[in-house]
């Protein structure tokens, strides 16, 4: 198929369209012929999507009418005809919009002819899986070039050709399919967050909107977000579910401004069924991004579309974030994801070992869980090191092998979490002196922090009760035992003590 035929059809389309539409959407297209295939390049994803939805059907019709009477082979790509070969898009099916355009083209015909184009059978798009936890770059999200994949042609009397479009870029999910509710280990620390995420996944638009998950790194916020997205796609494969990091939203907006395509940017992000944005704290002090996200957020909620956000802190505590955004984040449900307790850490290790088809003795899992307390990511990293060490050495996993494979990490943990460090941290937190913790003073303002420090020492170090007592002014081990039991009781009944303990635990282990 010749470029001249394309130019001829474009001139015919020019007569049909208002000048502004033609100059905005058709004029920027570049074309090159390769054998019987015609490759059409759009400057960015938004132009590609718009041409795909609004003009592709008519262009195909004109090409068929003015060509050989056979439906043309057409590729719609992002890039330039002078650029290097585009990267391959993984298993990208023809988008539903193309099929709709082709169906509309056929409907315009009075009767079937050899030039008629029948709708192409479209397979449900699989969510695109990025490599493990790696984020796709902002370039990939906005203007990455991709080699289109062929869609299967449906049977029919007319000769069928594949219309190839850079499929799946339109609403690429970027979901990790291994992050599901089944692979998420539930415990006291994440029970509420998991329940809220499931409610949103099972009843989208009727649950909590927005759902805001916050907590430290590596605690499972991203896992839950992906689990919701995967469940939504499982229920409805045609759902437009988009997961991205907040920095990518900013990068897409900047690119849209550079290309004078901000309206298309708005249309893209406001047309999703569910928008999942990670690490919203990166919007801080980015006024233009906050302004655009504010309007996108409002449009999605007004349209009944689901929004899920995560952050490393409570939304009200994010400095540099506009108050109107903080206020709107509170419209739905805000849930904290806490560091996993010992039992949950053991369960996570056992589940990960089972997934890796590795036998992990319970005492070995308990040993690792006792010493790696900060977050799930570090816990999994430690387990991978142990498994690798076991494999390379040809030995079963034992506590001795764990000590060998994690000796540097364990040494660092022991150095960081010492009784001296705990005493100093607790004293600073309660604004008292370390000497007060070691003294015989029994006033509540000193006794309660001392009990908290003893309980933390019992949980975070390997010292015995008598050793801990000695380091707290020569106290008896029964005093330490009483302090630990008292703090455990207060954590259940006293919200202030519970919050203090969590804050101190987080400070000491991160």
UniProtKB/Swiss-Prot annotation:
<dbReference type="InterPro" id="IPR001957">
    <property type="entry name" value="Chromosome_initiator_DnaA"/>
</dbReference>
<dbReference type="InterPro" id="IPR013159">
    <property type="entry name" value="DnaA_C"/>
</dbReference>
<dbReference type="InterPro" id="IPR024633">
    <property type="entry name" value="DnaA_N_dom"/>
</dbReference>
<dbReference type="GO" id="GO:0005886">
    <property type="term" value="C:plasma membrane"/>
</dbReference>
<comment type="function">
    <text>Plays an essential role in the initiation and regulation of chromosomal replication. ATP-DnaA binds to the origin of replication (oriC) to initiate formation of the DNA replication initiation complex once per cell cycle. Binds the DnaA box (a 9 base pair repeat at the origin) and separates the double-stranded (ds)DNA. Forms a right-handed helical filament on oriC DNA; dsDNA binds to the exterior of the filament while single-stranded (ss)DNA is stabiized in the filament's interior.</text>
</comment>
<keyword id="KW-0238">DNA-binding</keyword>
<dbReference type="Pfam" id="PF11638">
    <property type="entry name" value="DnaA_N"/>
</dbReference>
<dbReference type="InterPro" id="IPR010921">
    <property type="entry name" value="Trp_repressor/repl_initiator"/>
</dbReference>
<feature type="compositionally biased region" description="Low complexity">
    <location>
        <begin position="144"/>
        <end position="157"/>
    </location>
</feature>
<comment type="similarity">
    <text>Belongs to the DnaA family.</text>
</comment>
<feature type="region of interest" description="Disordered">
    <location>
        <begin position="140"/>
        <end position="160"/>
    </location>
</feature>
<dbReference type="InterPro" id="IPR018312">
    <property type="entry name" value="Chromosome_initiator_DnaA_CS"/>
</dbReference>
<dbReference type="GO" id="GO:0008289">
    <property type="term" value="F:lipid binding"/>
</dbReference>
<feature type="region of interest" description="Domain IV, binds dsDNA">
    <location>
        <begin position="391"/>
        <end position="510"/>
    </location>
</feature>
<dbReference type="InterPro" id="IPR020591">
    <property type="entry name" value="Chromosome_initiator_DnaA-like"/>
</dbReference>
<comment type="subunit">
    <text>Oligomerizes as a right-handed, spiral filament on DNA at oriC.</text>
</comment>
<dbReference type="InterPro" id="IPR038454">
    <property type="entry name" value="DnaA_N_sf"/>
</dbReference>
<dbReference type="GO" id="GO:0005737">
    <property type="term" value="C:cytoplasm"/>
</dbReference>
<keyword id="KW-0547">Nucleotide-binding</keyword>
<protein>
    <recommendedName>
        <fullName>Chromosomal replication initiator protein DnaA</fullName>
    </recommendedName>
</protein>
<keyword id="KW-0067">ATP-binding</keyword>
<feature type="region of interest" description="Domain II">
    <location>
        <begin position="87"/>
        <end position="173"/>
    </location>
</feature>
<feature type="binding site">
    <location>
        <position position="220"/>
    </location>
    <ligand>
        <name>ATP</name>
    </ligand>
</feature>
<dbReference type="GO" id="GO:0006275">
    <property type="term" value="P:regulation of DNA replication"/>
</dbReference>
<keyword id="KW-0963">Cytoplasm</keyword>
<dbReference type="InterPro" id="IPR013317">
    <property type="entry name" value="DnaA_dom"/>
</dbReference>
<dbReference type="GO" id="GO:0005524">
    <property type="term" value="F:ATP binding"/>
</dbReference>
<feature type="binding site">
    <location>
        <position position="222"/>
    </location>
    <ligand>
        <name>ATP</name>
    </ligand>
</feature>
<feature type="region of interest" description="Domain I, interacts with DnaA modulators">
    <location>
        <begin position="1"/>
        <end position="87"/>
    </location>
</feature>
<feature type="region of interest" description="Domain III, AAA+ region">
    <location>
        <begin position="174"/>
        <end position="390"/>
    </location>
</feature>
<feature type="binding site">
    <location>
        <position position="218"/>
    </location>
    <ligand>
        <name>ATP</name>
    </ligand>
</feature>
<dbReference type="GO" id="GO:0016887">
    <property type="term" value="F:ATP hydrolysis activity"/>
</dbReference>
<dbReference type="GO" id="GO:0006270">
    <property type="term" value="P:DNA replication initiation"/>
</dbReference>
<dbReference type="GO" id="GO:0003688">
    <property type="term" value="F:DNA replication origin binding"/>
</dbReference>
<dbReference type="InterPro" id="IPR027417">
    <property type="entry name" value="P-loop_NTPase"/>
</dbReference>
<feature type="binding site">
    <location>
        <position position="221"/>
    </location>
    <ligand>
        <name>ATP</name>
    </ligand>
</feature>
<keyword id="KW-0235">DNA replication</keyword>
<keyword id="KW-0446">Lipid-binding</keyword>
<dbReference type="InterPro" id="IPR003593">
    <property type="entry name" value="AAA+_ATPase"/>
</dbReference>
<dbReference type="Pfam" id="PF08299">
    <property type="entry name" value="Bac_DnaA_C"/>
</dbReference>
<dbReference type="Pfam" id="PF00308">
    <property type="entry name" value="Bac_DnaA"/>
</dbReference>
